[in-house]
UniProtKB/Swiss-Prot annotation:
HAMAP family: Aminopeptidase_M20 (MF_00550). The gene is pepT. This is Peptidase T. Its cofactor is Zn(2+). It comes from Photobacterium profundum (strain SS9). Disulfide bonds: none annotated. Pfam families: M20_dimer, Peptidase_M20. Its EC number is 3.4.11.4.
Length: 409
């Protein structure tokens, strides 16, 4: 586990927040800066085929150290952090041997409380890395990067651990849904892969949401308020009417497990035009289609009731549930389970209430389930990770490489 924490702390110091309003890839220059750093580290580890392409994708390969044929496996993590909270000037703090109670985040009023985050009660005695309460931490997904590189370094330093080819990929812009857009599966060279992008220890995921974005555009008419009678149509009022037509019990804060939702994620209001940005999620493809039909029906209903003004709906499919692409390859899941069990980690198979690069890659011909990092509360200032969880992830990655080699002897 040499240098694992040091690597992680180094990577979170890079500002790599992605930006959905930018069309180029990567969407922010900071991701290229981190990519250059990772490329240099992989070269220092004497990996082969190390490459940073013009779109910010980093790839490399640890060659097999066995004579028999073993399918090449891939390990993937993303370099960007979520736009939901600042990732600039991250100041991690390490709480050693956590003994319970609130953890003060920096010098402000923010705390990490076991009342609000009960998972903390399971982590007594652990060493926890938190934020200072002003930014996210970046464990999503820089912990995955640190764990992959540490595992590869361990395999390099211990040639007695047998393994086949291991392909490494670090992607940009995952948090804005574009991480797989320009990923070259053929060049990557793996038969299957794992994203190291999950949460608490034991998570193993090969199901994710089907996802659609829904832009509701409400059109009004702007007139000077002093002469607006019978002329002005305030699009914000139309937008408010639409939001009130949506089911209040089918939102992220009211759903769990396999339940889908509608989520109003953004608003751009003005009198003349208001844009509502929704995301629609459902684990069942048919359920997603029904949700899209429901939203269109509400748009039609609202339009029919308006004497002035109008509403339009733009639906864009983002990604689909990888289960249909991964299930035919059950050995991929079984190998991950065996690796976890061999490391005294109980596999916790659950659906991802979100998406990963692996979801898209699975539909591009690279089956790609998701493995834990040891982190919690991603995308916000209460994000944290345990050092022990990170170490477990490294052990599982190493064991996964070893188990794959053994299986194909």
């Amino acid at each position: 586990m040499d240098n694992l924490v040091e690597r992680f702390l180094r990577y979170v110091s890079f500002e790599t927040q992605s930006n959905s309003s930018v069309t180029q890839c990567p969407s922010t220059s900071g991701q290229i800066v981190l990519a250059e750093q990772l490329k240099n580290e992989l070269i220092e580890l004497e990996l082969v085929d190390v490459e940073l392409d013009e779109n910010g994708y980093v790839m490399a390969r640890l060659p097999s150290n066995v004579e028999h044929d073993v399918p090449a496996i891939g390990l993937i993590a993303h370099m960007d952090t979520a736009p939901d909270a600042s990732g600039k000037d991250v100041v991690p703090q390490i709480v050693e041997n956590y003994q319970g109670g609130d953890i003060a985040l920096g010098i402000g009023d923010e705390v990490l409380s076991p009342i609000q985050y009960p998972d903390l009660r399971k982590l007594l005695g652990h060493n926890i890395i938190t934020t200072d309460g002003t930014t996210l931490l970046g464990a999503d997904n820089k912990a995955g990067i640190a764990e992959i590189i540490t595992a590869i370094a361990h395999l390099k330093a211990n040639p007695d651990i047998k393994h086949g080819d291991i392909c490494i990929g670090f992607t940009p812009d995952e948090e804005i849904g574009r991480g797989a857009n320009l990923f070259n599966v053929e060049k990557f060279g793996a038969k299957w892969a794992y994203t190291i992008d999950g949460g608490p220890v034991g998570e193993l995921e090969f199901e994710n949401f089907n996802a659609t974005s829904a832009d509701v555009i409400c059109h009004g008419v702007n007139v000077h308020p002093g002469t607006a009678k019978n002329k002005m149509i305030n699009s914000m009022n139309i937008a408010a009417q639409f939001q009130l037509m949506m089911p209040t019990e089918e939102t992220p804060e009211c759903t769990e497990h396999y339940e889908g939702f509608y989520h109003l994620k953004s608003m751009e209001p003005s009198v003349a035009k208001t844009e509502l940005g929704y995301i629609i999620r459902d684990f069942d493809r048919k359920g997603l289609e029904q949700r899209k039909v429901f939203m269109q029906s509400k748009v039609d209903e609202l339009n029919s009731s308006l004497t002035k003004g109008r509403v339009e709906l733009i639906l864009t499919d983002c990604y689909f549930n990888m289960r249909e692409m991964v299930e035919p390859h059950q050995h991929i899941i079984e190998l991950a389970k065996e690796a976890m069990i061999a490391c005294d980690v109980k596999p916790d198979i659950k659906p991802i209430r979100g998406g990963t690069d692996g979801a898209r890659l699975s539909f591009m011909g690279l089956p790609c389930p998701n493995i834990f990092t040891g982190g919690y509360n991603f995308h916000g200032i209460h994000e944290f990770i345990t050092i022990e969880g990170m170490e477990q992830a490294v052990r599982v990655i190493v064991k996964l490489a070893e188990k794959t080699s053994e299986k194909y002897q």
